[in-house]
Regions:
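Extended substrate-binding grooves/exosites of carbohydrate-active enzymes
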Residues: 29-40
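Conserved alpha/beta catalytic core and glycan-binding cleft of carbohydrate-active enzymes
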Residues: 39-50
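Acidic/polar-rich alpha-helix caps and helix-coil junctions
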Residues: 1-27, 52-269
């Protein structure tokens, strides 16, 4: 993301490197290590903005999907990603993505890793979209989606700015009450701030982690069809466990003992 972007508020500037690309390019790209592989759980959350086509499930979607995630059929690293059996990106290869997806957000396309090519990387810690999302969440909890209580924007107006920036084709949020609008804000945070180190902490503060983080992790199995198309089958690739105690970190034993046990350990530890 450009340092000169008017949306950037706080950014950590890194030097020229290719570590992000090395760690996250598809395994079939020379030098790539297939590190972060997004889940199908996340991909399914991106809204449709056109006709639903099961044979082409990544078309007509919220454009933030294409901007953030490499899907089967994407043009990436100068070629078309094909994860079907026997293809260059065959998912059966060692260290290939188990979910059928690769990270795209933050990466520079088509760096020649074998020649040591590098790019500037900046980590944006805080940006304007987060302010709008924080504002929308707080205003909704305080006054509901459509009462600005004398402030500049309503919760709905702030949320719509974020969505319009992504695509003017995204439909307006129609949630009419506080509870439904809360879910709309949470959805928008999941999409807009994907891979920016917010989702886990959001789930903790919303007390949703027990439900969400105990769901199976899903991916897709890609198969070639007659002609030049593919078929996609949702498959379970992993199980996760989140315990009630994981909402809190434990105090170290030494801290508890040094307090003469006046410091009580968090529940479950």
């Amino acid at each position: 993301r450009s340092l000169s972007s008017p949306e950037t508020i706080y950014v950590v500037r890194r030097g020229m490197s290719n570590d992000m690309e090395k760690n996250n390019y598809p395994i079939a790209t020379q030098g790539g290590a297939s590190g972060v592989t997004p889940t199908h759980n996340l991909v399914k959350a991106y809204e449709w903005i056109g006709e639903v086509d099961p044979a082409n499930p990544y078309a007509n979607r919220d454009p933030r999907l294409e901007a953030s995630i490499v899907t089967n059929g994407s043009t990436w690293n100068g070629r078309t990603i094909d994860q079907s059996a026997g293809a260059m990106d065959d998912m059966a290869q060692p260290n290939a993505s188990r979910t059928g997806y690769y990270l795209k957000k933050f990466l520079t396309d088509n760096l020649n890793l074998t020649q040591g090519a590098t790019a500037q990387h900046n980590w944006v810690v805080f940006r304007y979209a987060e302010i709008l999302l924080n504002y929308a969440e707080a205003m909704n909890e305080a006054y509901g989606p459509d009462d600005n209580n004398g402030y500049t924007l309503t919760a709905r107006e702030a949320l719509q700015i974020v969505r319009d920036r992504a695509s003017m084709l995204l439909p307006e949020v129609t949630a009419e009450n506080k509870d439904d609008f809360r879910e709309a804000v949470r959805h928008e945070r999941r999409i807009e701030l994907a891979f920016e180190d917010h989702r886990y902490w959001d789930l903790l503060r919303w007390k949703d982690a027990m439900e969400v983080l105990n769901e199976p992790v899903y991916g897709v199995k890609v198969a070639k069809t007659d002609g030049n198309g593919w078929s996609y089958e949702e498959v379970e690739v992993a199980k996760r466990t989140f315990l009630e105690r994981n909402y809190y970190m434990p105090f170290s034993r030494s801290e508890v003992e040094n307090s003469n046990h006046t410091l009580e350990q968090n529940p479950g530890y």
